[in-house]
Amino acid sequence: MPSAPRKQSKTYKVPRRPFESARLDAELKLAGEYGLRNKHEIWRVALTLSKIRRAARELLTLDEKDPKRLFEGNAIIRRLVRLGILDETRMKLDYVLALRIEDFLERRLQTQVFKLGLAKSIHHARVLIFQRHIRVGKQIVNVPSFVVRLDTQKHIDFALSSPYGGGRPGRCKRKRLRSQEGGEGEEAEEE
């Protein structure tokens, strides 16, 4: 346990109305499109987005030349640009308010693996990540919700230890190869 205890807080916020049909349909569509396992993953992103938008709204109430607005506003924008959520052509606080949940879901490792063509489907991408077949740079990442930065996006690849990345073949393939070698040996003995 760390020496300084931290205050734990919830990472997601449940909707105020649990059975609002329009929201339920929208969440189901998002979960299917981005291969999410449950609604908590959507709510977690929604909470992150709401915190960022709340900070941007508070900063927009200040005067344009206010040093706090300039400093904190630039920090928020720089962070979003580095993550690839905000485009470099739209580096203003007004554009931060226009962000959507989809902008954050696009930057997940699961989505990026599928978009790069390393996986056959978005669900296959999730399985590949969980089974430690994907690396970002030199680091194997097994968290589908890992947020990929712009500079590390080009380093997403199969892990060197993975059968997909030229590593040792999988258990079934090794068994098949062994049985083929054994079958060839028996044929030679019969002749």
From Swiss-Prot:
Superkingdom assignment: Eukaryota
Pfam families, per database record: Ribosomal_S4 (PF00163), S4 (PF01479)
PTM annotation (Phosphoserine): residues: S50, S161, S179
Biological process annotations from GO: cytoplasmic translation; ribosomal small subunit biogenesis
Alphabetical keyword list: Cytoplasm, Phosphoprotein, Ribonucleoprotein, Ribosomal protein, RNA-binding, rRNA-binding
Record-listed Phosphotyrosine modification sites: Y164
Keyword check for Ribonucleoprotein: yes
Compartment(s) where it occurs, according to its Swiss-Prot or TrEMBL record: Cytoplasm
Domain S4 RNA-binding: 107-181
Record bears the keyword rRNA-binding: yes
GO function term, MF aspect, one: structural constituent of ribosome
Listed InterPro entries: Ribosomal_uS4 (IPR022801), Ribosomal_uS4_CS (IPR018079), Ribosomal_uS4_euk/arc (IPR005710), Ribosomal_uS4_N (IPR001912), S4_RNA-bd (IPR002942), S4_RNA-bd_sf (IPR036986)
Annotated GO CC locations: cytoplasmic stress granule; cytosol; cytosolic small ribosomal subunit
Positions of the UniProt region annotated as Disordered: 166-191
Further comment: There are 2 genes for uS4 in S.pombe.
Function: Component of the ribosome, a large ribonucleoprotein complex responsible for the synthesis of proteins in the cell. The small ribosomal subunit (SSU) binds messenger RNAs (mRNAs) and translates the encoded message by selecting cognate aminoacyl-transfer RNA (tRNA) molecules. The large subunit (LSU) contains the ribosomal catalytic site termed the peptidyl transferase center (PTC), which catalyzes the formation of peptide bonds, thereby polymerizing the amino acids delivered by tRNAs into a polypeptide chain.
Quaternary context: Component of the small ribosomal subunit (SSU). Mature yeast ribosomes consist of a small (40S) and a large (60S) subunit. The 40S small subunit contains 1 molecule of ribosomal RNA (18S rRNA) and at least 33 different proteins. The large 60S subunit contains 3 rRNA molecules (25S, 5.8S and 5S rRNA) and at least 46 different proteins. Interacts with snoRNA U3. uS11 interacts with MPP10. Component of the ribosomal small subunit (SSU) processome composed of at least 40 protein subunits and snoRNA U3.
Membership in a protein family: Belongs to the universal ribosomal protein uS4 family.
Protein name: Small ribosomal subunit protein uS4A
Source organism of the structure: Schizosaccharomyces pombe (strain 972 / ATCC 24843) (Fission yeast)
Record gene name: rps901
